[in-house]
Amino acid sequence: MRQLKREVKIGNVTIGGNNSIAVQTMLNVPVEDIEGNVAQAKRCEAAGCQILRVTCPSAADAKCIEAVKNAVNIPIVADIHFDYKAALACADVGVDKIRINPGNIGDDDRVKAVVQACQQKNIPIRIGVNGGSLEKHILAKYGAPVPEAMVESALYHVRLLEKFDFNNIVISIKNSNVPRMMEAYRQLSAVTDYPLHVGVTEAGTYQMGLLKSGMGIGGMLLEGIGDTIRVSLAAEPEKEVEAGYNILRAVGFPVAGPEVITCPTCGRTQYPCTEIANEVEKRLQGYKKSIKVAVMGCVVNGPGEAREADIGIAGGKGEAVLFIHGEPIKKLTGDHILDQFMDEIYKI
């Protein structure tokens, strides 16, 4: 059962409570390239990104935040490290949320200045704790970025914001070690009702990043923990968005658009099952209808394995049996099985 947290409004997206889990990503174009950032932001929006983070190393770079915000219709989060004046500048241009890493933002007076700027414009703050940048005294106490250390850091900074009468807060507590990350989120969720942004930081190259994020983020969601997610990948941010939705779909959350399932194939396979499955998925990109499509290798296990699909095929030599809701309908034959199958999919 999902652990319900208080609601926080980020631009036109509300997280927490019973609201849908929002999928985020972060631009990776150099901040000086405003045109490139705007173009990438538009691609992320088209891919379905719901909340978009943009780095802002200095106050002067707030002009990039402003340009991106004016170019898309999704909330923009300013990612702030070290320079608290960058956060103030982003608040001035109307950013929708500010993410700070409390371990490097500076003394309490600087944090207070950021809080006051956000209070004036009702801008939420994400406390972004990262296992790689914990405060020195906390690392000295625990010896490593263990879950208890990360939770202590997060709660310290929550109390700091609360001391300044600020509770428009989101928390993340990321680590590149999946078991540590999961245990940290468990401990944090047990003691706070602020919404949680879930992710695995520094997850690695694309393939390993997908695996670690699937385990970490998916595992947390299955435990009912998480209100917004970001899949961190060494890849284009549009790929992070796609991966985020795939994780949501894999753990049972309703996601608009098609899901293509296929078997791993074996020696019984007599038609290009994998190639057809990949091509079906490619052709269905951007298709908005929520359907499950199965491409199975043979008629031995295929029909049973695809019974929960809306439509599917199970192949044989030069032919494939078409199934709709688990029932065999007809055979598709010849050199154009893929095209025939796509025609049937669009009829569903």
Model-derived features: positions:
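Glycine-enriched alpha-helix->loop->beta-strand junction motifs that scaffold or abut catalytic
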Residues: A71-I74, D92-I98, Q119-N122, S189-P195, ...
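Alpha-helix-loop-beta-strand connector modules within alpha/beta enzyme cores
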Residues: A59-I80, A113-I125, Y185-L196, V280-L284
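Hydrophobic or amphipathic alpha-helical targeting/insertion segments
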Residues: K85-R126
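Active-site mouth loops of central-metabolism enzymes
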Residues: N18-G36, T55, I74-F82, I138-V151, ...
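Catalytic alpha/beta core domains of metabolic enzymes, predominantly
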Residues: V129-S133, I138-Q285
